[in-house]
UniProtKB/Swiss-Prot annotation:
InterPro entries: Globin, Globin-like_OT, Globin-like_sf, Globin/Proto, Mb-like_M. Pfam families: Globin. This protein is one of at least six components in the polymeric fraction of Glycera hemoglobin. This is Globin, polymeric component P3. Polymer. Residues 2-146 form the Globin domain. Disulfide bonds: none annotated. Keywords: Heme, Iron, Metal-binding, Oxygen transport, Transport. Belongs to the globin family. The keyword Glycoprotein does not apply.
């Protein structure tokens, strides 16, 4: 899947509102808590246990969420530079090989959780646009993971 120039421009234009505030920490945390609520078996893969409500105060998870949001922002900023975009995400995917049993099949549900978190933060979020953007970003990362 490829994005049009208009889609790239729209993603870049909307990113500041999506990431506004605390650098994405709350958005990332919300993404993970939604993900774990819907996919409780994934808590073990990420090294967590217990109730998802308790994770809202977990500094490790907060930091991981903030890093993911930062990386999405980096990817969005590189969307119009295909080779840089692909190289950055391919490398990130390869790095994820060292984090345990991470599989490409985990990313669609994580994307759903991210879109829900974004939608609760940004009034009028273009979910179709962001679903396409996430798909392109995650596909590039998965290519690195599976290489």
């Amino acid at each position: 899947m490829h994005l049009t120039a208009d889609q790239v421009a729209a993603l870049k234009a909307s990113w500041p509102e999506v990431s506004a505030g605390d650098g994405g920490a709350q958005l990332g945390l919300e993404m993970f808590t939604r993900y774990f609520d819907e996919n409780p078996q994934m808590m073990f893969v990420f090294g967590y246990s217990g109730r998802t409500s308790a994770l809202k105060h977990n500094s490790k998870l907060q930091n991981h969420g903030k890093i993911i949001v930062h990386q999405i922002g980096q990817a969005v900023s590189e969307l119009d530079d295909g080779s840089k975009f692909e190289a950055t995400l391919h490398k990130l995917g390869q790095e994820h090989k060292g984090f345990g049993d991470i599989k490409g099949e985990y990313f669609p549900a994580l994307g759903d959780a991210l879109l829900e978190a974004m939608n609760s933060k940004v009034h009028g979020l273009d979910r179709t646009l962001w679903a396409a953007g996430y798909r392109v970003i995650s596909d590039a990362l998965i290519a690195g993971l599976e290489s």
